[in-house]
Amino acid sequence: KTVVNMTHHMFVNLKGLTDPCPTIEDHILTVNANWFLPTDNTMIPTGAINPVDSTPFDFRKPKKIGEALACEDDPNIILGHGVDHNFVLNQKRQGEIIFAGKCVDPETKRYMEIYTTEPGMQIYTSNWHDGFKGYHGVRMPRRSAVAFETQHFPDSPNIGHFPSVVLSPGEIYT
């Protein structure tokens, strides 16, 4: 048996590349999730599955990313220095292609939609970027990009009630 949890870690800033890269705090985010995974102080999910209601993680209706980041008294925002959490997507059947989310830059009107067959989506707001040089030498300061990582839940092999990531001999990963 093999543990498989494929994802990607693409960063986006819908404003485009300028030096230094602007923040994504005014990007408007919608996420198709009623639940998220809180983490411990090492940013590993605790095993709890919490409702997004009345938390900074409630993106069920379009909301600026910066509104969540401004909730500096929320323990989950404090631990991650921003958003670095997995959202439990509203999926009716495992493997079904669903709308996971949408991100819009209100200034340029650029947007992206995310669709997936995975049960979760990790969202990371580049909380640890420190001005390193990225694509074309553009400086990437904190909050200069956002990543949308569709995947199974982090630490699934160690948390029995999370969806399985075990692939048995003869099974095909889809």
Feature names for model-found ranges:
Residues 1-174:
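An exposed, glycine/acidic-rich loop-and-rim segment of catalytic or binding clefts
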